[in-house]
Amino acid sequence: MAFRLKLVPEKTNIDFFRWQFLTFGLSTFLALASIVVLFLNGLNFGIDFRGGTTIRTESTQSVDVGAYREALQPLNLGDVAITEVFDPTFGPEQNVAQVRISAQDGAEAVTPETVNAVEAALQEVDPSITFPSVESVGPKVSGELVMTAVYAVAASLAAISFYIWLRFEWQFAMGALVSLVHDVLITMGVFALFQIKFDLTTIAALLTILGYSINDTVVVFDRLRENLMKYKKMPLREVMNLSVNETLSRTVMTSGTTLIALIALLVLGGDVIRGFVFAITFGIVIGTYSSVYVAKNVVLWLGVKRDWSKQPTDEVAAQFRDAP
C-alpha cells in the first residue's frame, strides 16, 4: 500500500474571494509601502553595484576563507567578499581566492594604503600567499551594471507576459504581470527596509522568484481555462474558486517542500549565500500568495471572454431562420 503525504486535502471548498477586499488592500498597502521605503532608505548595494577593488590571491596552501575574513576584520573595511576560485586548469598546489572590497562613499576605489594593509594581513595568515593582480571598478561601471540588472528584470516581465497572452488571453497576461510586479516590488521593499545586501546574486534570486511565481500562476490559469470550457454556465467567480481549490494541494506541497530546503540553507548556509536564499524564501512565500489572491482577482475584475454567454452560433442560426 503506497503512502501519500497530504498537506492539504485533495478536495477543499475554500472561498478565496471572501476576503478579496482585505487581500487587495493588504497587497496595495505592501506595494505602496515598498515604494516609500525604497525611496527613503534605498537599497544596500553590494560590491557589484557600488564599485570597489578586487585582489586576487594565490597560495600553495588551501584557502581558508574564515581565517582570511578574521584577519581583515580589524581593518574595518566595510563590505568585504572573499570567495575561493576553482578552475580545472589550476595545478595541485595552486589555490586561488578573490578578496573584493567595496569602495567607500564618494571614492572611486580602495586606496593603495588599504590594499597594502590587506596584503600584509593576509600574509600573516599564509606567508606563501602572493597577489597576482589588483583590479578596481569605478562607480560608472557599477551604475551601468545596475541598469543592466533593471533591464534583465523588465525583459523577463515582458517576455512572461507575452507568453501568457499567447497561451491564454490578454486578461490573464495582465493578471500575471500585476502578480509578478507585486512579488518583485515587495521583495525589494523588504531588502530596503532591513538594509539587506543587494548584489548580483539577489538579481538572480529575483529572476528565480519570477519563474517560480509564474509557474504557480500558470497552473491555476490552466485549470481555470479547463473549467471555463467544462462549466460553461457557472459564474466566473465560482469557476475561479473551484480552480484554485483543485490546484491548492499541488501549490502547498510544491511550495512547502521547497521552503524546507531553503530554510535549512538559510540557517546553515552561512553569510555568503544568506541574501540569495532569503530573497528566494521570501519570494516563494509572497509568490504563492499572489498566485492565489492577486492574479485571479485581476482576471476577475477585467473579465474573461465567455463564448457561452454570447452564443454567436445561435444568433446566426436565428438570422437565417428569420430571413425571407
Model-derived regions: residue spans:
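A structural signal for conserved, well-ordered secondary-structure elements
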Residues: 1-324
